[in-house]
Amino acid sequence: MAAGSTYTPIATTTLGSAQATVSFNSFSGYTDLILVVAGTVSTANNPTLRFNSDSGSNYSWRYLAGNGSSASTGGSANQTSILTGGLGTSTIGNIIYHINNYSNTTTNKTVINRHNRADDSVTAWVGLWRNTAAITTIDLGAGGGNWNTGSTFTLYGIQAA
């Protein structure tokens, strides 16, 4: 879907210097959120996602990955963040997060993300935050290192039809 017709741009951040976490906290009035990342990290690893600064063991995730010659799957429960698609240190990777029903206060929160890197693989992930609170803060960690200078993060809102 084209940006502007369905997606409403909320905020874009392009890093002028490396940092460990990128946060968004000014969004409201949408049904779902889309967070698009294009970047690299200082230590090849999987970025992490947290909501409302919750660092408790309230997150679970699963993934399915493939590289053209093999496939793998895995996951974990009771984690302190949602693990998401792996990024490298030099080849730009892309991750698209779809945060479903983020403001609903009667259901746990789910996120679906897709990730790709030209030198590696494609992966689909699903994550769960076991909390019914509306999401008011999104923290995207670099997975143990830093997001490199030039990495770009764009948050979009989606209105229900």
Residue locations for each model-derived region?
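Surface-exposed molecular-recognition determinants
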Residues: 1-161
